[in-house]
Regions:
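Membrane-water interface segments at the C-terminal ends of transmembrane alpha-helices
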Residues: 1-56, 80-103, 127, 136-141
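Juxtamembrane loop-helix boundary motifs flanking transmembrane segments in multi-pass membrane proteins
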Residues: 25-28, 72-76, 80, 112, ...
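Amphipathic cytosolic juxtamembrane alpha-helices at the membrane-cytosol interface
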Residues: 58-63, 67-90
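Interhelical loop and adjacent transmembrane-helix boundary motif
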Residues: 109-141
Length: 141
């Protein structure tokens, strides 16, 4: 899913949440909840891969020390999380950056409805398409 284009992810969620889709009875399409689902689908693989890489590196570094102290996997996890807290914070910031820069999936499932589902990135896209570049630039800053 990490390489899935955002518009395709939005289309898949659209198909799931549309009235004829399996989750259509919940009426989530064109709501902020649908936008959150789209964002979660896009950033979850990135968060998982980066977190795994960070913690796997620590695991390899601390494995012998933890075993010599008699720590099993469940006792090692808090140590790894504590020592990897800055790496995990960086992972969360990377996920936030990815989510906040997203336009495609959010526009497909949210609809860019003024006052309801319009967010900064979709507003920038709208103003750019209308030719109001000064406003689009101002929104970006």
């Amino acid at each position: 899913l990490m390489g899935l284009p955002p518009v395709v992810a939005g289309l898949l969620i659209y198909l799931l949440l549309s009235r004829s889709g399996p989750l259509g009875e919940f009426g989530l399409l064109f709501t902020p909840a649908a936008m959150v689902v789209a964002q979660a689908m896009l950033i979850a693989p990135i968060l998982a891969a980066l977190s795994r890489a960070a913690l796997e590196e620590l695991w390899e570094e601390y494995l012998e020390q933890l075993r010599s102290l008699g720590a099993g996997p469940w006792r090692a996890v808090p140590t790894l999380l504590w020592d990897g807290r800055f790496a995990l914070l960086t992972v969360l910031l990377a996920g936030f950056g990815r989510a906040s820069a997203e336009v495609g999936a959010v526009m497909v499932v949210g609809g860019n409805i003024e006052g309801f589902t319009r967010v900064m990135t979709t507003a920038i896209a709208l103003e750019t398409s209308k030719g109001d570049l000064p406003l689009a630039l101002a929104l970006g800053l």
